[in-house]
Amino acid sequence: MKKRLIGLDKFFLIILKNIIKEEDIMQLYNTLTRKKEEFIPYVEGKVGFYTCGPTVYHYAHIGNMRNYIGHDILDKTLRYLGYDVKRVMNITDVGHLKSDSDSGEDKMVASAKKEHKTVMDIAKYYTDAFFKDFKALNCRMPDIVSPATDNIDEYIKIISKLLEEGYAYKAGGNVYFDVSKVDDYYQLTNHKEDQMVVGVREGVDFDDNKRNQADFALWFTKSKFDDQDLKWNSPFGVGYPGWHIECTGISLKYLGEYLDIHGGGVDNIFPHHTNEIAQSEAYLGHKWCN
């Protein structure tokens, strides 16, 4: 494959030229199989690359930025090797609760209250701050950056189909994904049902609306948090999307039904990426990520 030098900084090019040989085979670590594998995209020469972006309620810290630097190195290396890369990053500006287990206040709302600003003011300020740091680290801007709040119709479409096909259910005013309806829900991790609290960054509140402890919210209505600033009309009631459905909706919208690479922080393997796989493959009816 012919190498592409356009759009890559000189320092990075020098490094790549010194470490990559013509006969080298690109291998990537696959979290799903827990081993390095030869990278073969679904479509020869093209790469669909999705990365989970920041929740813009505060400044990104050095650990967050280390993650994005890693994605940037991979993005630039793929382009250097001649791949036609389309990289998409979301911006989470709604729906990410303080606990990954669907409990606690929305991080955006909490930050807005603390700083006496609107949620959208908070989102704009910290999004701008994030990309200022991103560029200062010489990271290449993704081809598409999409805020979660710009894609509500996508989430509604996906949730509606999941309800129709029995993968989701309504309870207590909210819509939940039923993890018992999918095979090998824990394929990305070693977690089990009775270990669900492990890996959740903050305390787990029991939700008696759920059929299974590991079920997760696709859509919250006003029955969950009456003071939620951002709400939209939907067939399920006035409310807002859950965190996990946002990445699925944005990825499918911009990259289609087959994804080559999904990147994110190791702290998102469970439950976020685990839930993404479950809902995406239930919706699509086939394997989602390469």
What is each PLM-predicted segment?
Residues 33-36, 42-138:
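N-terminal, positively charged nucleic-acid-binding surface of large information/translation enzymes
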Residues 82-85, 136-143, 168-169, 258-259:
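Surface-exposed helix-capping loop/turn segments at secondary-structure junctions
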Residues 24-57, 72, 132, 154-290:
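Alpha-helical recognition segments enriched in aromatics with Gly/Pro capping
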Residues 10-25:
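Short, Lys/Arg-enriched N-terminal segments with co-localized hydrophobic residues
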Residues 2-4, 17-18:
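Polybasic, lysine-rich low-complexity intrinsically disordered segments
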Residues 88-95, 123-130, 140-155, 173-182:
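Short, glycine/charge-rich beta-strand/loop segments that flank catalytic centers
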Residues 112-118, 144-149, 237, 265:
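The substrate-binding groove and active-site-proximal loops of carbohydrate-active enzymes
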